[in-house]
Amino acid sequence: AFVKGSAQRVAHGY
């Protein structure tokens, strides 16, 4: 998922 969001980045580990 290419979405700019810290929450999603943390969930994916980026």
UniProtKB/Swiss-Prot annotation:
Gene Ontology MF: a single term: toxin activity
GO CC terms, sorted: extracellular region
Tissue expression from the record: Expressed by the venom duct.
Modified residues (D-phenylalanine): F2
Entry-annotated residues carrying Tyrosine amide: Y14
Key words of the record: Amidation, D-amino acid, Neurotoxin, Secreted, Toxin
Transmembrane regions: none
Domain of life according to the entry: Eukaryota
Compartment annotation: Secreted
Main location: secreted
Other remarks in the entry: The mature peptide does not contain cysteine residue.
Function: Is a potent and mollusk specific excitatory peptide. Most potent excitatory effect are observed on the buccal mass. It interacts with non-cholinergic receptors. As this peptide is a major component of the venom, it may play an important role in prey capture.
Protein name as it appears in the record: Conomap-Vt
Source species of the chain: Conus planorbis
